[in-house]
Every structure is written in C-alpha cells, then in structure tokens.
Amino acid sequence: AVNKWDLAPDLGMNRGLTEQIVQERFKFVRHAPILFVSALNGDGVDALLQTAISAHEKGKIWIPETELRLANKHFISRHAPKSSKGIINLTFGKVYQESTSPPTFVFEVNRPELVHFSYHRYLANSLRKEFDLSATPIKIVLRAKPRKGLKK
C-alpha cells in the first residue's frame, strides 16, 4: 500500500509513475497489487481491506493433485527447466500441495539442487496465474524424486 496519497498532488506525483517505481524497487513481490491509500481521509482503505481479505481467503485454497499435475505438464511444456550447471537434464515428477497459508507446493525433481532460482519464480508465477492466487504468497519446495527400486 502506498500511504499518504493525499499528499501526492502537492508533490507532483502520479499513480502511473509511482506504480513503475514500486514495481522496479520491489521486483520480488510483483504479484502483489499496488493500492493507494490515505489513512487521513480514508481513501482506498476499503479496497485495501478487501484485498487483504481476498488474499487471505485465496491462501487457504487447496488444489487437487490431478489439477496440479496437468498444470505442471503445461508449465514444463511452455518453459522447460534448465540446470544451473547447464548440462544436467532435469526431470520433474510428482507435484502436490503440502499445506495452506501460505499455499506450499512440492515438486519432485531428480536434482533439486540444480534447479535455477529463476525457475522457482516461474513456477510460483505460473501457479498464481493458473489458479488465481494473485496477491498471495506461494512457497515452492523442490524435493528429490524417490529412486525406483530403493527401499525406504
């Protein structure tokens, strides 16, 4: 939230430029909406509260594994994972939701330590878009796929 927006006209500020500045400085939360409020006169406070309530509710959503599996196939076909080492072939297996608040998604992959950090962001943003989780923090966990034939 950009507070004290009632002072903006006197400072020569406009929403478009302010949104650009906020998005540039806070790249790590581009999924979060930018809301303009003035606590002094109450402008934008209702929208802020509604957005917070909506984000909280979306954070409690549970997505069935079958839907996640289909979405994951689509994500990978659209943008194949690359290894941070460049030559290792990464293969993703099972995907499931482990918890809510924040929604935590587990992706099984053959070499999780080699998945580039930008692919974490890609998966989180793809999940947000696919399942309407905007304004909701998402946790991505990459786990090693269990090896076939090994006893636990």
What are these model-predicted stretches?
Residues 1-152:
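C-terminal-of-GTPase-core extension/linker across diverse P-loop GTPases
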